[in-house]
């Protein structure tokens, strides 16, 4: 279970990044606490990525620094094949939560997550509107690891802009985030992990 904790470097205004960076970091801390309460059949890694954001402009080489490095290291160490699945969270704290179906994610894992969301009554938050996110799951997908990106907009969405009107602006502050959004995503992720434990060959 992974997310990034860095925020976009902005010199022209005070950028907090409460949702874009902050929400995933807070989520991972609580998920680590939750998962540590009981024993599990699977081994869980809670991974905090640095350098998800571009230093200048987003390109294949100026972005995803931490996840690219980690995927390369796991490959070199022969550890990558041990990973059954990767669940990435990013920008999950908006007060009006919307998680979109990411076409760059692994199909069977997408289906599992959205099925668990439906079971919990969260279908209005997990939308089957298809998008293609570029995020920290990409290096793992490219390396052959089943991965899913749970990501939503930051602030109100305008036509043609799925990132939200507060994305990378001074409006990305905690006042525009909601604890209930983190709770919803947390419950869905825990249900997904439970399903992976009980049915290791679910794909």
Give, region by region, the residue ranges found by the protein language model.
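Short connector loops/turns at beta-strand edges and beta->alpha or beta->beta junctions
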Residues: 4-8, 51-52, 92, 155-156, ...
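Soluble metallo-hydrolase cores and metallopeptidase-like ectodomains found primarily
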Residues: 1-14, 188-191
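Active-site-adjacent substrate-binding region
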Residues: 85, 94-203
């Amino acid at each position: 279970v992974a997310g990034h904790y860095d925020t976009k470097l902005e010199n022209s205004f005070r950028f907090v990044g409460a949702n874009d960076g902050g929400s995933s970091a807070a989520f991972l801390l609580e998920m680590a606490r939750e998962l540590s309460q009981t024993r599990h059949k699977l081994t869980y890694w809670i991974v905090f990525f640095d350098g998800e954001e571009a230093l200048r402009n987003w390109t294949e080489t100026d972005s995803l620094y931490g996840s690219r490095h980690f995927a390369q290291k796991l490959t070199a160490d022969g550890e990558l094949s041990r990973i059954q699945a990767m669940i990435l969270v990013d920008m999950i704290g908006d007060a009006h939560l919307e998680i979109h179906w990411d076409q760059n994610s692994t199909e069977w894992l997408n289906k599992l997550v959205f099925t668990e969301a439906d079971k919990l009554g969260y279908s209005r938050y997990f939308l089957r509107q298809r998008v293609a996110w570029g995020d920290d799951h990409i290096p793992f997908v490219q390396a052959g690891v089943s991965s899913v990106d749970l990501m939503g907009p930051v602030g109100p969405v305008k036509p043609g802009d799925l990132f939200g009107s507060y994305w990378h602006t001074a409006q990305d502050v905690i006042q525009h985030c909601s604890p209930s959004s983190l709770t919803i995503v947390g419950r869905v992720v825990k249900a997904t992990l439970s399903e992976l434990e009980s049915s290791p060959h679910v794909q």
